């Protein structure tokens, strides 16, 4: 399990990619992280390969997503950490060539962008919410994987 600390929290406040109010067209493998982001994609006809959700926004405001996902997985991931269970499930899901999967988080999904970038293949599009700004869209690259590895090394491991 990795625990968030002040140094990494400060780094994570900066978006990893470009922030959009409305996303441009997206091609290839897509992973969405967060309920509002996923709901926006689905309402615009974009079905992510994997959606990571906790059915809340800003930690406690419920979000209704009426979409029926093809395959659903659940893991626990407490606030402020990346659980081993979440890491293993994301690692597994990165190997599946399927669409319309959901990973439902009991806890909080905010930090799970990190293992998604670590384990999903290069050129995967990752979309997550940047609070009060919009959505961040990035393509996984080797350079981004190295940046994520550094963040993981800076986190406390238990």
From Swiss-Prot:
Origin: domain of life: Archaea
Ligand binding (GTP): 35-36, 54, 56, 109, 132
GO MF term set: GTP binding; kinase activity
Pfam families: DUF359 (PF04019)
The entry's keywords: Coenzyme A biosynthesis, GTP-binding, Kinase, Nucleotide-binding, Transferase
Pathway linked to the protein: Cofactor biosynthesis; coenzyme A biosynthesis
Reactions that this protein is recorded to catalyse: 3'-dephospho-CoA + GTP = GDP + CoA + H(+)
Enzyme Commission identifier(s): 2.7.1.237
A single GO BP: coenzyme A biosynthetic process
Family label: Belongs to the GTP-dependent DPCK family.
PANTHER family: GTP-DEPENDENT DEPHOSPHO-COA KINASE (PTHR40732:SF1), UPF0218 PROTEIN TK1697 (PTHR40732)
Cited function: Catalyzes the GTP-dependent phosphorylation of the 3'-hydroxyl group of dephosphocoenzyme A to form coenzyme A (CoA).
Protein name, UniProt field: GTP-dependent dephospho-CoA kinase
The organism of origin for this protein: Methanococcus maripaludis (strain C6 / ATCC BAA-1332)
């Amino acid at each position: 399990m990795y625990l968030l600390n002040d140094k990494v929290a400060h780094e994570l406040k900066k978006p990893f990619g470009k922030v959009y109010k409305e996303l441009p067209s997206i091609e290839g493998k897509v992973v969405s992280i967060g309920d509002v982001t996923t709901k926006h994609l689905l309402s615009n006809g974009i079905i992510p390969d994997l959606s990571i959700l906790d059915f809340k926004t800003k930690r406690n405001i419920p979000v209704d997503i009426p979409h029926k996902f093809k395959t659903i997985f659940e893991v626990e991931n407490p606030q402020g950490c990346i659980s081993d269970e979440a890491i293993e499930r994301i690692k597994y899901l990165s190997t599946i060539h399927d669409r319309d999967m959901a990973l439902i988080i009991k806890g909080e999904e905010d930090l799970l962008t990190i293992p998604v970038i670590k384990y999903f293949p290069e050129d995967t599009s990752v979309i997550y919410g940047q609070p009060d700004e919009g959505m961040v869209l990035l393509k996984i690259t080797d350079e981004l994987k190295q940046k994520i590895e550094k963040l993981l090394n800076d986190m406390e491991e238990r």
